[in-house]
Structure formats: C-alpha cells, structure tokens
Curated annotation (Swiss-Prot):
Cited Gene3D superfamilies: 2.30.30.100
Name of protein: U6 snRNA-associated Sm-like protein LSm6
Gene Ontology MF annotations: RNA binding
Keywords per UniProt: Cytoplasm, mRNA processing, mRNA splicing, Nucleus, Ribonucleoprotein, RNA-binding, rRNA processing, Spliceosome, tRNA processing
Function in brief: Component of LSm protein complexes, which are involved in RNA processing and may function in a chaperone-like manner, facilitating the efficient association of RNA processing factors with their substrates. Component of the cytoplasmic LSM1-LSM7 complex, which is thought to be involved in mRNA degradation by activating the decapping step in the 5'-to-3' mRNA decay pathway. Component of the nuclear LSM2-LSM8 complex, which is involved in splicing of nuclear mRNAs.
Subcellular location: Cytoplasm; Nucleus
Cellular-component GO terms for this entry: nucleolus; P-body; sno(s)RNA-containing ribonucleoprotein complex; spliceosomal complex; U4/U6 x U5 tri-snRNP complex; U6 snRNP
Source organism: Lodderomyces elongisporus (strain ATCC 11503 / CBS 2605 / JCM 1781 / NBRC 1676 / NRRL YB-4239)
C-alpha cells in the first residue's frame, strides 16, 4: 500500500472517539433516524445520545432526554 493510499484511510474508532460530545445522526436498518449529542459508543456500536430526537420521513416524531441504541440495529453514524 502506498503512502497516499494509507493517508486516505481513517480508522473508524478514531473517528467515532473524536466526535464524542458532537451532534450526530444515527440511521437504523429499519429506516428510523435518531439525532442527538453523542455521549458514548462501544465496540459493538451500542450508542448513547443525549437530547435525542426520533426522525421518520424527515419529520421529528418524538423528543427524548436520553436515547440508547443497540449496535446491531445501527446502519451508520454521521456527524451533523
């Protein structure tokens, strides 16, 4: 692998560790999306959000103080 190729790759655990406390979007396999402040994430992709919102079809359907998402349901996590 060339040096240029290795610079383009990001270790997901470093990325996820770097966005703790940031506003994130978590999409689940069933299409439901949660938005909130990332409090913690573990090696199984279990996620805890604070000030969470449930979003279905681009509409906020519920507000939560804390949201806990099981990792096997998570499709992706992105920083807002």
């Amino acid at each position: 692998m060339s040096e240029a190729e290795s610079l383009d790759r990001i270790d997901p655990s470093k990325f996820l560790g770097g966005i703790i406390g940031s506003s994130v979007k978590v999409k689940l396999h069933n299409g439901v999306e949660y938005q909130g402040d990332l409090q913690t994430i573990d090696g199984y992709m279990n996620v805890a959000l604070e000030n969470g919102k449930e979003v279905i079809d681009n509409k906020v359907t519920k507000h939560y103080g804390d949201v806990f998402l099981r990792g096997n349901n998570v499709l992706y996590i992105s920083e807002n």
